[in-house]
């Protein structure tokens, strides 16, 4: 599919247009019809009425290294086929953001616990990616400003991770928020699991400026 990706990037970068490849792994949010036992940091599954999500299998050290290799390999393919840059998806409850959430990641090894440990997989990916694609190929990360869930990834932790990513060589950080359990950002009433959701400020809702406070910080 190398030639197909080249044709795609050629079409997408005409007239000085940029075309970035977003790279992601669904983790525990993989539909059960696709994988009834998906990989995740811990065996904490989603409970969404009417949806089929399997109980996750906690990742081994070998799994972690394999996922890192796959993210880096895909980034190299993006560069070699002419994409402008890559974005690693670490928001909305996908695998990388699952590592950041203390509500989902209850590991007691070097990949869990402190925010430094929970962000480790990100930093390893960025480090390896830089070695493979060089300094002149842009790298972005899509990062939750918060999960908007009790006990989840907080704005204060997100700011710390953003600083880590910048220091690691990330060029652009796109801010987002929420997970499958809290898919909308306008308040508890929009949540699938309201008991675990945090209320958004009314002033923020009125402006539809969901990440304004985070950006100001």
Model regions and ranges:
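Flavin-dependent oxidoreductase catalytic cores
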Residues: 1-217
């Amino acid at each position: 599919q190398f030639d197909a990706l080249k044709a795609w990037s050629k079409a997408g970068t005409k007239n000085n247009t940029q075309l970035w490849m977003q790279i992601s792994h669904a983790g525990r949010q993989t539909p059960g019809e696709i994988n009834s036992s998906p990989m995740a940091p811990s065996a904490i599954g989603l409970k969404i009425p009417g949806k089929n999500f399997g109980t996750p299998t906690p990742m081994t050290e070998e799994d972690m290294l394999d996922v890192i290799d796959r993210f880096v390999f895909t980034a190299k393919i993006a560069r070699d086929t002419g994409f402008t840059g890559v974005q690693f998806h670490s928001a909305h409850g996908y695998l990388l953001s699952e590592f950041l959430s203390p509500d989902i990641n209850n590991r007691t090894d070097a990949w869990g616990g402190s925010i430094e440990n929970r962000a480790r997989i990100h930093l390893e990916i960025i480090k390896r990616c830089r070695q493979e694609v060089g300094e002149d190929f842009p790298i972005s990360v899509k990062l939750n400003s918060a999960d908007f869930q009790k006990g989840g990834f907080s704005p204060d932790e997100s700011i710390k991770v953003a600083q880590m990513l910048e220091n690691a060589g990330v060029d652009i950080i796109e801010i987002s928020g929420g997970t499958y359990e809290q898919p909308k950002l306008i308040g508890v009433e929009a949540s699938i699991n309201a008991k675990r959701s945090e209320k958004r400020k009314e002033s923020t809702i009125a402006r539809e400026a969901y990440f304004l406070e985070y950006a100001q910080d």
